[in-house]
Design a protein with these regions (language model features):
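Solvent-exposed loop/turn segments at secondary-structure junctions
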Residues: 29-32, 89-92, 114-117, 130, ...
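Extracytoplasmic ligand-binding site segments that recognize negatively charged/polar headgroups
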Residues: 1-80
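Conserved C-terminal helix/tail region of periplasmic/extracytoplasmic solute-binding proteins
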Residues: 74, 182-213
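Mature extracytoplasmic/periplasmic domains
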Residues: 126-187
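A ligand-binding cleft/hinge motif common to bilobed small-molecule-binding domains
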Residues: 83-104
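Sec-exported extracytoplasmic/periplasmic mature domains
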Residues: 11-15, 19, 37-41, 64, ...
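Short, hydrophobic alpha-helical packing/hinge segments within bilobed ligand-binding/sensory domains
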Residues: 72-73, 81, 135, 148
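Periplasmic-binding protein-like
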Residues: 52-61, 70, 103-127
Length: 213
């Protein structure tokens, strides 16, 4: 097992060994390319086109080892894969399904030692919304402790509603890939803003990687 979990996918030395049992990758340029840049020690949301050239070169080297492009939930749970680059919630859902379905698969969501990409789900009300009061009612409903906790318990993601924490399953609050340690939080990379030009470069890089060109 490499010290940095990213190496399991981005280092051909490890990826080749996992090819036979299956590796999946998210079908998302805005997730995969920043992850590759971060692995290379570049800014995950770089504005330097040369960085994307390096990321493309890195990913071309591992392309033969990628079996499918998907979230990996069902394939992991069913034993069709042994490694997946995916969202922590999806990986933990796969682990839960494997356990409940008694598929014989032991799945663990790994937090890379160098950190990963951090994201938040947000709720917002458009300035010109026709029924802003209804939107406030819905948001207030989602923020109810019992509702926020049920979402965490179902989706395997952390809740930012402090009052909900006592209602979240202990198995989830103890899971360090869901509720990150303070040390892990410091290493996470928040989602950055990309210009249209950089987004086009990112998409082109991912397309070249996915098609093997």
């Amino acid at each position: 097992m490499p010290e940095n979990a990213w190496s399991l996918i981005f280092d051909p030395k490890y990826a080749k060994k996992l090819k036979s049992c299956g590796i999946s990758m998210l079908d998302s340029a805005t997730d995969v390319i920043p992850a590759a840049l971060h692995y290379l020690g570049k800014p995950a949301y770089s504005t330097n086109p040369a960085d994307y050239t390096e990321a493309t070169k890195l990913m071309r080297a591992i392309r033969p080892n990628i079996k499918i492009f998907s979230s990996g939930i069902n394939d992991l749970a069913g034993g069709g894969l042994c490694m997946a680059l995916g969202y922590s919630g999806d990986m933990n859902i796969a682990a839960k399904r494997a356990k409940e379905g008694k598929t014989g698969q032991t799945i663990e969501a790994l937090v890379p030692s160098t950190g990963g990409l951090l994201f938040y789900d947000n709720m917002a009300i458009p300035a010109d919304a026709e029924h802003p009061n209804n939107a406030h009612i819905f948001i207030n409903y989602i923020l109810r402790p019992e509702v926020a906790a049920s979402i965490s318990n179902k989706m395997n993601y952390a809740t930012m509603t402090a009052a909900a924490l006592p209602l979240v399953d202990k198995e989830i609050t103890a899971n360090k890939s869901i509720f990150l340690t303070d040390d892990a939080k410091k290493k996470m990379v928040a989602q950055g803003v990309t210009t249209n030009d950089m987004r086009r470069i990112m998409t082109r890089s991912f397309t070249q990687f996915k098609t093997g060109l």
